[in-house]
Amino acid sequence: MAVLLKLGVLCSGQGARALSLRSRAVRPAFVSAFLQDQPTPGWRGTQHIHLSPSHQSGSKAASLHWTSERVVSVLLLGLIPAGYLNPCSVVDYSLAAALTLHSHWGIGQVVTDYVHGDALQKATKAGLLAVSALTFAGLCYFNYHDVGICRAVAMLWKL
């Protein structure tokens, strides 16, 4: 009977909220991060989790960069089938630009994450910019003087 009484208290409006939001055993960590207005009574030494630095959270340039990365990724999802269904020079040059941008931004993030030191990181990013420019120039040269990206991939598939 005592168990049913305690279960009834826990399942009431206040008891269920207390069980689900206040108990560290039940509450997942990601919920804890967003419940920062009232600390849990009886718990000391809890830290507030900040998901992003406050000085970068309002940056319009970072938001536009993130959005443009997603636009290029979605554009690639449409260009690849378009290159298969309708291989033409417009799709070839669009693929050259989108693939170069996508790989440049992706490798740039790897450089940012894993290359340490300001001078080394700047030199690596300068090298990446040079390689990306040469890649785009090479793909455009290939599109202009040869069969193009779409037809070249189709020829490879026929092998």
UniProtKB/Swiss-Prot annotation:
It is a multi-pass membrane protein. This is Succinate dehydrogenase [ubiquinone] cytochrome b small subunit, mitochondrial. Component of complex II composed of four subunits: the flavoprotein (FP) SDHA, iron-sulfur protein (IP) SDHB, and a cytochrome b560 composed of SDHC and SDHD. One of its GO terms (molecular function) is heme binding. A ubiquinone binds at residue 114. Heme b binds at residue 102. It holds the Pfam family CybS. Membrane-anchoring subunit of succinate dehydrogenase (SDH) that is involved in complex II of the mitochondrial electron transport chain and is responsible for transferring electrons from succinate to ubiquinone (coenzyme Q). SDH also oxidizes malate to the non-canonical enol form of oxaloacetate, enol-oxaloacetate. Enol-oxaloacetate, which is a potent inhibitor of the succinate dehydrogenase activity, is further isomerized into keto-oxaloacetate. The keyword Iron applies. Residues 1-56 form a transit peptide. It comes from Rattus norvegicus.
